[in-house]
Regions:
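Structured helix-beta-strand junction loops
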Residues: 59-60, 109, 187-190
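N-terminal non-cleavable signal-anchor helices
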Residues: 14, 18, 182-185
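His/acidic metal-ligating clusters that form di-metal
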Residues: 140-159, 169-190
Length: 190
């Protein structure tokens, strides 16, 4: 069985989506980097900003958020009562200074739709104490399987990849893309 994949990276605008075989489904999707670092590193009032981001997600069927590191409770306070949020991996105790993936996927879909979210952490990163410091986050991706009420399935990928402009950053992103492709191929073989 061939699966349908919708691969989205770093889009800041909503858009309408595709058809599956003979049935048309139209979604409003938001992909947004929330800039959710701890307050000590930013000065844009995340305690005020994150509930507003949560409220904005109510206008979309699917919201794929990145950098939801430190203000998830504030974000959740703005969600609709029917909203379903899946937060990415939270890291491990081996690095107490490291944060989780920062990924959050929020769904406002009609009744009868099934959502299954798998979180994967990248094996490669670039930057501990210089550059973008991406190794302090357990960055990765979410493979989201959505099943319609009539059992049509499709997948969406939410990811937050390595930042930076150095060769080591580009190499890490290349490895991260390979990781995503490998995970997709495993799904296609099922």
């Amino acid at each position: 069985m061939k699966h349908k994949f919708l691969f989205i990276i770093y889009l800041l605008i909503p858009f309408e989506v595709f058809s599956l075989e003979d049935e048309n489904f139209s979604f409003n999707i938001l992909v947004y980097n929330t800039h959710g670092l701890p307050e000590i590193f930013i000065d844009d009032n995340p305690k005020k900003r994150f509930p507003i981001i949560g409220e904005k997600t109510r206008d979309f069927n699917i919201s794929l958020l990145q950098e939801d590191y430190s203000h998830h409770e504030e974000l959740s306070s703005g969600l609709g009562t029917e909203s379903i949020a899946y937060r990415g991996g939270m890291g491990t105790f081996l690095c107490p200074l490291c944060t989780g993936s920062g990924l959050t996927s929020i769904f406002n879909l009609p009744d009868g739709w099934l959502i299954d979210v798998e979180n994967e952490t990248y094996e490669d990163c670039s930057g501990w104490l210089r550059g973008a410091n991406d190794c302090f986050a357990y960055k990765g991706f979410q493979i989201i399987k959505i099943t319609t009420p009539n059992e049509k399935e499709f997948y969406i990928i939410n990811t937050h990849m390595d930042a930076g402009r150095r060769d080591s950053d580009r190499h890490a992103r290349e490895k991260q893309l390979e990781h995503i492709v490998s995970a997709i191929k495993k799904k296609e073989d099922i």
